[in-house]
Amino acid sequence: MELLSTPHSIEVSNITCDSFRISWTMENSDLERVTHYFIDLNKKENKNSNKFKHRDVPTKLVAKAVPLPMTVRGHWFLSPRTEYSVAVQTAVKQSDGEYLVSGWSETVEFCTGDYAKEHLAQLQEKAEQIAGRMLRFSVFYRNHHKEYFQHARTHCGNMLQPYLKDNSGSHGSPTSGMLHGVFFSCNTEFNTGQPPQDSPYGRWRFQIPAQRLFNPSTNLYFADFYCMYTAYHYAILVLAPKGSLGDRFCRDRLPLLDIACNKFLTCSVEDGELVFRHAQDLILEIIYTEPVDLSLGTLGEISGHQLMSLSTADAKKDPSCKTCNISVGR
């Protein structure tokens, strides 16, 4: 049987967090003969591994020939925000069950995308299921080392400046390494209604009245839901003043929450005053997208311990947790 030509001019398009479309060019004489495609997909750092030594052995992905471009989809082998290399081979399945195969095409590289809004909506729904009842609170707080606040006063005009979010949480979160903001907490002790006296982030705490950051002029977005191989679960929320740069970033990427009615963090008017509540059973990480003036709050030293084991800095999400994972790339 006549040999197959080698596929060439590989094109990868329509890339999402767990799928892509691929097409290539092959000789017209092969179009009617080819019955299968072999697709060799590798994470970029391993792009030279796992090439099969024998031309007649199928590679990782085997697909029946379909009109191109074809969609490759599967969260079991594709992860978001990950660089891959891909090469293809065409084949004709013969009557004896063996394959006549072409040579390998050139290798091309691409990077998968972030979670889309519909994926984040699935995470949001999972987080809502364990959020628990709502508790009242009155302040947002941020713990850090004394030198951090001294630097803000001396070199930043008494302002806490937004910084780039790290890679903690879900690997597919569109905020990681992209959104600038100032991190705050709001969780309170069940028995006192006050912020806890322990913190993993430093012994100095800046507290600011909740209404300074969260009010009807603020948009609230759901950004992530994760755990770190422990029983604790974290939800990341974004507070962005309406029309701000951070608000424009979030608008196209994150689910928007009703500030007065959601399962995580609310601001509502009761008896003519703003009342704030947070979910009891989630540790909330709040990202405020604008600079924060230290003169709007108070700074003091906490009496508890610095619990480093609870730090979420660059924390990796547990990919096996059924509570906080969805059926797309982790």
UniProtKB/Swiss-Prot annotation:
Transmembrane segments: none annotated. Residues 6-115 form the Fibronectin type-III domain. GO terms for biological process: protein localization. Pfam families: fn3, PHYHIP_C. InterPro entries: FN3_dom, FN3_sf, Ig-like_fold, PHYHIP/PHYHIPL, PHYIP/PHIPL_C. The keyword Nucleus does not apply. One of its GO terms (cellular component) is cytoplasm. Keywords: Glycoprotein. GO terms for molecular function: protein tyrosine kinase binding. PROSITE patterns: FN3. It comes from the Eukaryota. Glycans are attached at residues 14, 325. Belongs to the PHYHIP family. Interacts with PHYH and ADGRB1. PANTHER family: PHYTANOYL-COA HYDROXYLASE-INTERACTING PROTEIN, PROTEIN CBG15099. Its interaction with PHYH suggests a role in the development of the central system. This is Phytanoyl-CoA hydroxylase-interacting protein. It comes from Bos taurus.
